[in-house]
């Protein structure tokens, strides 16, 4: 399964959104989006990249052939180059412009930053809900007397 992040802790505690966000599908589709952005920018700067090549790249962002990636990675021993090759198989007219002039860190590091940003935005939204719920709870029970504790002992009024 490539659409969910897998680990013992994640399967117990992570939300469906976070499992999908940190999945292989999201990571490698983000790589492909970055390659599309790179090709588009290079085209605008005058490199010999056609609009048809960019369009073909855009058409194949989500259809990742993981069997092809795995086979190619065993041959070249490089995850990014295995994905470049596989993307080129899906978009043959654009194969020569995928990753043009980029380093591996262009896709790996930037994809991580995009995923972390999205995760933090999600966490922020969830924290806002928690804070609102706690504020409502505190307001609702503000007049309720409670037993106080200090140093793990209940307070005794003398």
List each language-model region with its residue ranges.
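A helix-coil-helix interface module used to build multimeric assemblies
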Residues: 1-155
